[in-house]
């Protein structure tokens, strides 16, 4: 495993444990060249679908692309790395239902928005603003209005 800090390839595993959802092994590693520590996750390789983009291009499913989008939306929010990894795993599992087939990128985007909406309103709106390509403030306000209505309905149903 290559060190993300110095590029060294010699490291030792300091700690290994199964993730909360049981689908990955989390390892803390220490680089033998620079002494810094970093975390890696080990997953079972599964057949994942080809993603069909809006413009018709096809590309392989990329877990890291999902992670980066969710991480960017959750930036400076009280959301742990483990929670983000759990969301990424949930999206990946959703896509595994289309294993060997194709899945539209819009289905993946909608799944991420649904998960973020349940987790954190600010992260949801951030993701939606990029995913839905808001053109101006009115688009943004319309999305906020819909989110607030759903949020208010949930509050009314709580005992």
Swiss-Prot record:
**Free-text comment on the cofactor:** Binds 1 zinc ion.
The family database entries (InterPro entries) matched by this protein are listed as:
ATP-cone_dom, NrdR-like_N, RNR_NrdR-like
Does the keyword field hold Zinc? yes
Q: Which residues form the ATP-cone domain?
A: 49-139
**Among its keywords, does the record have DNA-binding?**
yes
Per the record, the zinc finger regions (unnamed) lie at 3-34
Q: Which GO terms describe its biological process?
A: negative regulation of DNA-templated transcription
Record-linked PROSITE patterns: ATP_CONE (PS51161)
Q: Where is the signal peptide?
A: none
Similarity annotation = Belongs to the NrdR family.
**Biological role:** Negatively regulates transcription of bacterial ribonucleotide reductase nrd genes and operons by binding to NrdR-boxes.
The protein depicted here goes by the name Transcriptional repressor NrdR
